[in-house]
Each structure stands twice: as structure tokens, then as C-alpha cells.
């Protein structure tokens, strides 16, 4: 190996280490923004929201048929929340919801959600969103031990009505669930 290859490898590693330092430096800033958004949503909500679970779907490629035949995919339940739109047009929400899980047992979840929102049509009422939710849930098959969740969010909406969804990743016969609900803003 000649000297130029060593210089190239050293430069690559050095640049990566500098990048990691910047990530950690920005982590404090990101966490401060996260906490401030939660506080502002709680203290200054623009809307009160009603959540109605709509569907759970277990990805058929990731399950044995005999398992999916037994699972509940009609997650009736409900929830309430507070939300606001920020100066960039992005959505922030605090919510609590309970629904019937795959085993038809109650599963509560509460947390904070954020979506970057686009309004691609001339009609400003139509909106699309992509973001995340961070919260806590508890399941019967885990003895209702509180479990932290960090999941993706996506939505399509018109005015005060939004169809919002997430995907719970997993392994074979576990997780890999699409979950969606309606959110009505008042």
C-alpha cells in the first residue's frame, strides 16, 4: 500500500470522527427543541383532537397464515389529544389512545407526534405529512409493563380530518404491523 492510500484512509476516518462530534453537539440542540415543542403544544394548543383507530394489518409476508387468521385487525377504541401547527406549517400533537390489539386486548398508548406537512395542491386544506411519534405503550402479553416507542408517522388529510398511520417494524411472526387511525381536529 502506498502513502496516498494511507492518507486517504486516515482522511476518511478523521472526517467520520469530526462528523460524530457534530452529531453529539447537535443532540443537545435537538433535545431542547423537542422539549420546547412538547411544552408549547401542551401550554398553547390550537386544537383538541379525537382519535378513532381504523385498521391494523399484519404484513402477510412476515407471518404464518395460521397466526394472521387468529389476529384482530379491527382495533376499535379511541383517544383524545391536543395539537397545533407551527410557523412552518408542521403539525405537533400530544395524545392518549386505547385500542384493541392483535390479541383483542386493550393497549394504551400516549405520546408526542410531529409531522412535516406539505400542501401540494392549490387547495390549502389538502395536506400530506411525514414524521415520528415518541411515547409509551403497554401490552397484555408483556404484563402491561410500560414500553417506550419511537415510530414513523405518515398522514393524508383535508381540513380538520386526517388519516394518520404508522408501521411497527419486527421480525418473522412478530411486529410488522401497519396501524392507522382517523384524527378529527376541533
From Swiss-Prot:
InterPro entries: LipidA_acyl_PagP, OMP/PagP_b-brl. Its main location: membrane. Keywords: Acyltransferase, Cell outer membrane, Membrane, Signal, Transferase. It catalyses: lipid A (E. coli) + a 1-hexadecanoyl-2-acyl-sn-glycero-3-phosphocholine = hepta-acyl lipid A (E. coli) + a 2-acyl-sn-glycero-3-phosphocholine; lipid IIA + a 1-hexadecanoyl-2-acyl-sn-glycero-3-phosphocholine = lipid IIB + a 2-acyl-sn-glycero-3-phosphocholine; lipid IVA (E. coli) + a 1-hexadecanoyl-2-acyl-sn-glycero-3-phosphocholine = lipid IVB (E. coli) + a 2-acyl-sn-glycero-3-phosphocholine. It is an enzyme of class 2 (transferase). The record marks 67 as: Role in lipopolysaccharide recognition. This is Lipid A palmitoyltransferase PagP. The record marks 172 as: Role in the phospholipid gating. One of its GO terms (molecular function) is O-palmitoyltransferase activity. GO terms for cellular component: cell outer membrane. One of its GO terms (biological process) is lipid A biosynthetic process. Its EC number is 2.3.1.251. The active site is at 58, 101, 102. The keyword Plastid does not apply.
